[in-house]
Amino acid sequence: MLDRLKIILSPAEDLIQNEIQHPITGQKLELAYFLPLIDEQKIHAFITVPFSKNEYPFMNLLKSNPNFTKVTDPATWTDLLLRGQALIEFQDQIFSFDAMKFSYTDLSEANLETSILGPQNSLSEDPIISLNIIRNAYVSPELVIDKMNVGNLSRTGLYIIYDQRKVNKHTLDLVMNKLASVHLDLIQSTGQLERLLNGKKYQLFPTLLITERIDRIGRALSF
């Protein structure tokens, strides 16, 4: 399953693919899911812990527990993963597990930009929650998420997000090269990073936009 997913899915930092081998029985389990979309506590409680303890035949658990559904069509794998399902392969059979984690309850309203129409919620300071929001707003297997760190001391984490099918390769390379050329010790805000990427104090036409609106991010990805 994991080898096939590497072919049909775009590479993404948030796509977790694990092969787990039981230390006593030697049985193997393959597991795949998008980290921002799922509740890892559910993964541990329903999959990894029962498999490792082996107190009950794991195949019996997969077949008897209503949280697991047998998947017979590989064409549905991508959609299931993008909808917050975890995929499990055990003894040459594929099962899906609903581990969806998706909530807007802790989000604040957008401050940088207001909108009369569309969602009023902004991104979260927690990058995993923000990636959850973006993946739910832009449900596509072509969405690529790359992680980088900037700042020699701060090692500030950032994510480059783009649609592999629609992205302008030249622009993507330009952004990657500019990010790689940032050599400050501390990067503490998006505004500071924007000034470093622009390279100029004043520009006749803007080339970068800072936004926290979900609808604008989805629209930008779709171009």
Features from the language model and the residues they span:
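Membrane-embedded alpha-helical signal segments
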Residues: 1-223
